[in-house]
């Protein structure tokens, strides 16, 4: 019985691979169904014999309560975008300045959702969304219902891989036809359909929707020496990789590939929105490293966005939290990239002057980065006798004089008590990526500000339930709920607070780097500018912005008030002692470990102060090698790098 079940699982998985991955089915649907029903009957009679890679795991559904947060062991970085050949050439120049011998690999940019798959001993244990790159959502049960995601691998390896989950065009058309017949709203585009499907709490729906994947990265330390070898390894392990890639000796080669793919784009069975260009050599990737947000060794070329004509009906001017005054055009509605667009950014006053944009003009509208509607240019042939657009001289919020500095393209309100700026700062402070105060959105901020209850972020922590009950729409329950959310936010780790302060140029990733290094905001407030600038991924711009902010009397007063309100100013993550055994060292983990899981070994190395890298380079200080270490160990030996084993790591 056990042998027959094993045979059926093996045969059915092979047939599924032929159908879903190779598009070369060797048996009829009827023959597959007969074998599948036999397997179901055997598993029903003998549930103790069900194998982890049985295809029956992919069908049927169960209702999930929700999705738990999942902290990625290996962060997922976003990519720097490029929209022209000139920007690609600038990327190439930056790479070749340090590595003139570098070559590239060009891969299609699939228009789907980034996912991470983690296997232990060859079994799928976690499937997660990208989230913010550090924390995503655990959607393992849903990803198990995606037909081409391997439930087990042919080798009992520990590995984390990255890729894209998408909805093929054929599946999209089928699903939308079904929704239309059922009287349900159709999905706007395949990407939205894939996103909605992966967020389903009913796993049975996921199984029916026909999602697919392309995997392209080994996130855990790799034995490969190039990105092309990574793709070959993923292929060998049973993952679906996209074979529409090319190796390029120069940026000219990459541009040739981009042009050829652009011509074939509509004929592909899936949506793409560009081409990703990566340095192929993993050692060079390691040397180039990362900025705060993105790798220096890759760039995502985005295809030109869809464009439509629309008329500018009027222009609104709004003030953001940094005082920048932004013009937004109100448009005659147009359908653009699957959505109705009636507003589009005009960027700034210099852009309006450069393009000579006027109210009443017919303009070309597109979605910048396929996300933000923007005005590209005026259609001159429709120009009538419109007047030059009036530019405001006073802030639309506080009526203060606006400034237009020579080195800036935007108008700016410099009034420190401008209501719009203050409210925007409060909204940002309460936002999910900052202090995450649930329920404190723009409408509530406006009410609090209008009632004179808050003027800066410290005032939020002075609010009482009675204060909230004075606001329109608040009852005892809602007031207590918001009050508790405010109190809960006091215990956030300090990087949330630092990001929430809205210091110019200091984003969420930079905030974490800073508080990890300095431990708390009071220490950071007195840090030397050069000490800040020297941190990996930061630099002088962020350092100057921070030191200028904390040097102000207002910032010192704000910190004092937050401390008095018992808001946590300390980093609550793992802090590494500067005297730790591996402090400041770059360590590569390679080979098969006998007693520790790879993520446990990585966590221990980091706790000891090490920066764990994915491949050996000149910057590597130490290699911890298990069995079957392969080429990584060989390269380390050639470079004279110190080698240690698992027993040594355990002894620390």
Swiss-Prot record:
BRCT domain ranges (all copies): 577-652
Keyword line: DNA damage, DNA repair, DNA replication, Ligase, Magnesium, Manganese, Metal-binding, NAD, Zinc
Cofactor(s) of this protein: Mg(2+); Mn(2+)
Keyword Cytoplasm attributed: no
SUPFAM superfamilies hit by this protein: BRCT domain (SSF52113), DNA ligase/mRNA capping enzyme, catalytic domain (SSF56091), Nucleic acid-binding proteins (SSF50249), RuvA domain 2-like (SSF47781)
Residues annotated to bind Zn(2+): 395, 398, 413, 418
PANTHER family the record matches: CHROMOSOME TRANSMISSION FIDELITY FACTOR 18, DNA LIGASE
Protein family according to the UniProt entry: Belongs to the NAD-dependent DNA ligase family. LigA subfamily.
Protein name: DNA ligase
Organism for this UniProt entry: Streptococcus suis (strain 05ZYH33)
Lineage of origin: Bacteria, Bacillati, Bacillota, Bacilli, Lactobacillales
